[in-house]
Amino acid sequence: MFIHVGYYHLIFNCIIQLILGVLLEVVHKFWRVGIVYMFGVVGGALAHSVVDSHVALAGASGGVYSLIGAHIATVITNWDTMQKNWLDNPAHFFSSGVFRIIALLLFCVPDFGLSIHRRINHPEQPNGITPHLGGFIIGILIGIPVLRNLKVEKWEKICFWISLLAFIALIIIAVVYNVLCIRPKLCPNIYYSN
């Protein structure tokens, strides 16, 4: 979480953490956002250990992408509230769900693309890209139950339990996988150093 691959990676992570973190903290309080962020870091690292453990892991991308996923979760659960009169007033447009999703895509697609580019074009220094996906998925799954909702509807209560159970199941599966793959004979594709 404290080591990064180059200045671009460090600066991008800091900017996204500040922008998205502050926006989420204003509505949901710092401790809820902290929970999402830390679970995103852990979830990203677990995803990396399951899928791509032979590659170096650096940066806070799991946490950053969990904040992006948490914003998506907020947009999903508050869609009706955000879309109310969104075309009538420019201020409403900038707070609408459509604008937020487009803005998030403009932030994360170039960063994720650069990570894939670095992974493919620099095989001598491979870098993990699964923490991005793991953090994003964890951000959505934990964002729905942890972050506050403005107006709770019946489908959102169902979504709450589904996302919470999916989050718990993914964490348990990843931990069990890591525990069972301690011995090289169980996981022959993983490089073990002496």
Descriptions of predicted regions:
Residues M1-H71, N78:
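Transmembrane helix-loop-helix
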Residues I35-M38, K84-D88:
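Beta-strand segments within the central parallel beta-sheet cores of soluble alpha/beta enzyme folds
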Residues A45-A47, A56-A60, A70-A73, A91, ...:
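A sequence-composition feature that detects small, non-aromatic residues
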Residues A70-T77, I142-V146:
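Interfacial segments of multi-pass membrane proteins
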Residues D80-M82:
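Non-transmembrane, extramembrane segments of multi-pass ion/lipid transporters
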Residues N85-N194:
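C-terminal transmembrane module of polytopic alpha-helical membrane proteins
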